[in-house]
């Protein structure tokens, strides 16, 4: 799925979870969360010497349901401690941030699974790519 769609969906998740507490900043944090799984493109290029292995790494573990669960705690905890300082102290809870990152990260691989390329939703337990193949993707 294209990055714009993932950013907008992540922003919508951020607004739904924290919009009333932190306003438009929730859109930004949700958009960041919505793009986190696609950082595997850069990680794959760093880890592997050739482009084929790097592309095979894409839509792997960082697009799995397990990563959504683990990642939401990591990014939620980190953001909670960085955001809740000074005047903003006490405006949000750790649970708010974990939920924001869970929904923004979780929706990313679900949306990607509707494309013909598929997504390894069950990685690292299975390398099967779930692909519903009902949204066409036009890659430039």
Tell what function each PLM region has.
Residues 1-140:
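N-terminal membrane-targeting hydrophobic helices
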């Amino acid at each position: 799925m294209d990055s714009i769609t993932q950013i907008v969906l992540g922003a919508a998740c951020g607004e739904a979870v924290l919009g009333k507490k932190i306003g438009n900043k929730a859109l930004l944090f949700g958009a960041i969360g919505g793009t986190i799984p696609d950082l595997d493109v850069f990680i794959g290029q760093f880890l592997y010497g050739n482009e084929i292995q790097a592309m095979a790494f894409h839509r792997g573990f960082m697009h799995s349901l397990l990563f959504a669960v683990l990642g939401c705690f990591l990014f939620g905890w980190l953001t909670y401690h960085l955001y809740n300082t000074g005047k903003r102290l006490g405006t949000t809870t750790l649970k708010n941030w974990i939920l924001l990152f869970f929904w923004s990260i979780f929706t990313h691989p679900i949306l990607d699974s509707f494309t013909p390329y598929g997504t390894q939703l069950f990685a690292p337990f299975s390398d099967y790519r779930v692909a519903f193949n009902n949204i066409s993707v036009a890659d430039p």
